[in-house]
Curated annotation (Swiss-Prot):
Pfam families: Ribosomal_L27 (PF01016)
Keywords per UniProt: Ribonucleoprotein, Ribosomal protein
Organism field: Janthinobacterium sp. (strain Marseille)
Keyword Ribosomal protein: yes
Name the record gives this protein: Large ribosomal subunit protein bL27
Family (UniProt): Belongs to the bacterial ribosomal protein bL27 family.
Primary gene name: rpmA
Signal peptide limits: none
GO terms of molecular function: structural constituent of ribosome
Transmembrane region(s): none
Length: 85
C-alpha cells in the first residue's frame, strides 16, 4: 500500500489575458491616417479634430499629422486632436 496522501485541489490558477489598453501615440508624435492613438474602455478621452472613434471606443487619426492632447470645457474633458502636418 502506498504511503502518499492524495494531492489537494485548488480553486486558483486562472487569469484573464491583458487587453493592452492605453495611449499608443503620445503628444507631439507624428501619426498616419488610420493609426491608433488610444485604446480604451469607455470614453476616458474624447475625439477632437481629425480624430475618429471606433465601436470599442478606440481613437484613431483621420489625417496625417501630429497628435495633441487638450483639456477643455466645464467638465475638463480630455480631447485628442491631430494637427495636420
Amino acid at each position: 500500500m502506498a504511503h502518499k496522501k492524495g494531492g489537494g485541489t485548488t480553486r486558483n490558477g486562472r487569469d484573464s489575458e491583458s487587453k493592452r489598453l492605453g495611449v499608443k501615440v503620445y503628444g507631439g508624435q507624428a501619426i498616419n491616417a488610420g493609426g491608433i492613438i488610444v485604446r480604451q474602455r469607455g470614453t476616458k478621452m474624447h475625439p477632437g479634430e481629425n480624430v475618429g472613434i471606433g465601436k470599442d471606443h478606440t481613437l484613431f487619426a483621420l489625417t496625417d499629422g501630429k497628435v495633441a492632447f487638450v483639456t477643455k470645457g466645464a467638465l475638463q474633458r480630455h480631447y485628442v486632436t491631430v494637427v495636420p502636418a
